[in-house]
Amino acid sequence: MIRATARSAAAPDRLWSLASDVERWGDRLPTVDVVRPLGSGLTGVGSKFEVRQPGLPKAVWQVTDWQPGRSFTWVSTSPGIRSTAVHTVQEDGDGSRLDLSLAWSGPLARVLELLIGRKARGMVETEARTFARLAEQA
């Protein structure tokens, strides 16, 4: 499992507003080219998004847990692999903390980890740091 944590002087609601606005990740994160909703309405459990990231095949992610102001989980599946990403915002003293995790399961999980594990770790760490920095700038 890949984990990354970033602390921010910003209030938790500000950090949440950035991390949960997945449709704008392409504008905010160097690790994401574009996120396109596959459907309409508010983001919540069942929402699906097509995500394109540099050097990775496009993936469809579906929200499986949505706790407004606190956390969301989404899952992407492809043959032999299930990817699960969790995004959690918490109060941390006078500011906030963002915890990100990415886990792979399935018969090809170990192969994927060997192929892109280092790259994925760097991307998750970059995302955590970027959201924390952007929250402080707003």
Language-model features: locations:
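Generic recognition of short, well-ordered alpha-helical interface segments
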Residues: A10, D27-P30, K58, G122, ...
